[in-house]
A protein has these predicted regions:
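N-terminal nucleotide-binding beta1-loop-alpha1 segment
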Residues: 1-17
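Short, well-formed alpha-helical segments that are part of the catalytic scaffolds
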Residues: 17-40
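Conserved N-terminal catalytic core of the sugar/cofactor nucleotidyltransferase
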Residues: 32-93
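Acidic donor-binding/catalytic loop of UDP-sugar-dependent glycosyltransferases
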Residues: 79-84, 99-116
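Conserved nucleotide-sugar donor-binding
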Residues: 92-93, 139-151, 196-200
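Short aromatic-hydrophobic micro-motifs that form the base-stacking/packing surface
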Residues: 94-98
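Conserved donor-nucleotide/metal-binding helix-loop-beta segment in metal-dependent transferases, i.e.
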Residues: 106-132
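Conserved alpha/beta core of the MobA/IspD/sugar-nucleotide pyrophosphorylase nucleotidyltransferase superfamily
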Residues: 142, 163-226
Length: 226
């Protein structure tokens, strides 16, 4: 049986917003927002947090341990090796690559992408090329076999930092662009945590949505409030 595993790339280090993975949005850590939402997926077979073996990322590993979430620790300088190690640790076949600084990611979009992957003979299912979703909701799905190939063949800095980068560099790879429903096409909305102003905005959104919809509010709820 094919195993589809989400790996969440999470680091505490950030030049613009240090410690952002453990920042509270509406009283809940950023990482917890994302993990809780991904656990509501109906198509994922599991998830794992990929972080570094550096001391500064201990809070991420400690959080994962307390909450019973799988966590892989690898190189602090090689995101591709770290992502591959996490996926191999989970014995996956298909990779769903997620950034930890996207706390309000809607699992329904992930599930739609997995369904497209299952029905098509392609190397990548992505929303990232069309860029119609709010920033922080894009999904990329590809095979573990492809990730292993990239890890062996690609040593460019872009590839080692962004594991899906090689898929977009050659016409060799078969890419399917996932089209999302029109009511989700709000590309001007930024739901990524990268700066203090992002933290302030997302914190206000979290508080407003929590009051109306509860802590696991979805994208529809966010758009209604925004």
């Amino acid at each position: 049986m094919t195993r589809v595993i989400a790996s969440i790339e999470a680091r505490m280090g950030s030049s613009r917003l240090p410690g952002k993975m453990m920042m509270l949005l509406g009283g809940i850590p950023v990482l917890e927002h994302l993990v809780t939402r991904m656990m509501k997926s109906e198509r994922l077979d599991g998830l794992i947090i990929a972080t570094s073996d550096q001391f500064g990322d201990d809070p991420i590993a400690n959080w994962a341990n307390r909450h019973g979430v799988q966590c892989y620790r690898g190189s602090g300088k090689d995101g591709m090796a770290r992502g591959l190690g996490a996926q191999e640790n989970m014995r996956s076949d298909v990779v769903v690559e997620l950034c930890g600084d996207t706390p309000f990611r809607d699992p329904r979009i992930v599930d739609d992408a997995i369904e497209e992957w299952n029905r098509r003979d392609v190397d990548l299912v992505t929303t990232a090329r069309l860029r119609t979703l709010p920033d922080g909701q894009d999904v990329e799905i590809f095979s573990l076999k492809a990730l292993k190939y990239f890890a062996e063949k690609h040593h460019e800095p872009e590839a080692r930092e962004h594991v899906s980068w090689p898929l977009y560099q050659s016409d060799t790879w078969r890419i399917h662009d996932l089209v999302v429903p029109e009511h989700w096409q709000r590309s001007a909305l930024r739901l990524v945590l990268d700066t203090p102003s992002d933290a302030q905005f997302l914190g206000h959104l979290a508080a407003a949505c929590d009051v109306k919809y509860g802590p696991t509010f979805n994208l529809d709820n966010l758009l209604a409030v925004f």
